[in-house]
Amino acid sequence: MSQFNVLNRYLFTDAHARGELVQLSSSFESIIKNHNYPVGVEKLLGELLCATCLLTATLKFEGDITVQLQGDGPVGYMSVSGNNKQQMRGIAKMAEETSADTLQTLIGKGTMIITIRPNAGEAYQGVVALDEESLADCLAHYFDVSEQIPTKIWLFCDTEQQLAAGALVQLLPDGDGSTENKEQQQSDFEHLCQLTNTIKSEEVFSLEAEALLYRLYHQEQVNIFEPQMVSYLCGCSADKCLSAISQIEPSEIKAILAEHGKISMTCDYCITTYDFDELSLKSFISKVNH
């Protein structure tokens, strides 16, 4: 537990493959706090959070990734964003109350949209249908379609303990995008997937990364990189709210203040409410007289 909110990356040096393991506690708790989501929604949001962590760890540049689920089910929209510093935020929007607890019954018929935005360069998107039974399988399909890289993902969430975790195994391409010794590499990949399939939820929520990786891969040559901390970062602030208010006509600001005595703005992500009274908005109101 003490080492949760951490993402570990590692190489299988004899198998031309890579892996990732993310274990989250307070960063997941912060995303669901104050929202009163149903259990099934919390579980899927925890899985999506871990999936986005795993995806951002694949970035080779400074930037961010947003993974959105959109569909015609009771949860019409769910989104998690994260950057190369593993700073995450997420939200779910429900069209109706639901006791559903699977991807298909929560989102319904829909799509997964993955948007990658480098700080320098053009953003690009990948879109796949949510045709698989689980979010993990949909992500593996995304890699198969968009990257042509064999990838397997495992996702776990315990809403009672407010813990979430995920693992990834991915075959490494060679320099020109193909794989050398394909049959051997595919065999190695399947072997690593079989080992990772033995992971149990009680292990991923109780063992620290080093112990868990040893349990899974003690017969493999594994090179573990420096772990990276994962944190919750909503990004809202009073200054950003004031910037939004500045786009409102001064006369309208004055009218709202006259009726309500303040302007209130609530962040969709963290549910923090910012209140601005006449004094704090004096500079905006003064424009109405000019």
Curated annotation (Swiss-Prot):
It comes from Colwellia psychrerythraea (strain 34H / ATCC BAA-681). It is found in: Cytoplasm. The keyword Cytoplasm applies. GO terms for biological process: protein refolding. Redox regulated molecular chaperone. Protects both thermally unfolding and oxidatively damaged proteins from irreversible aggregation. Plays an important role in the bacterial defense system toward oxidative stress. This is 33 kDa chaperonin. GO terms for molecular function: protein folding chaperone; unfolded protein binding. Belongs to the HSP33 family. CDD domains: Hsp33.
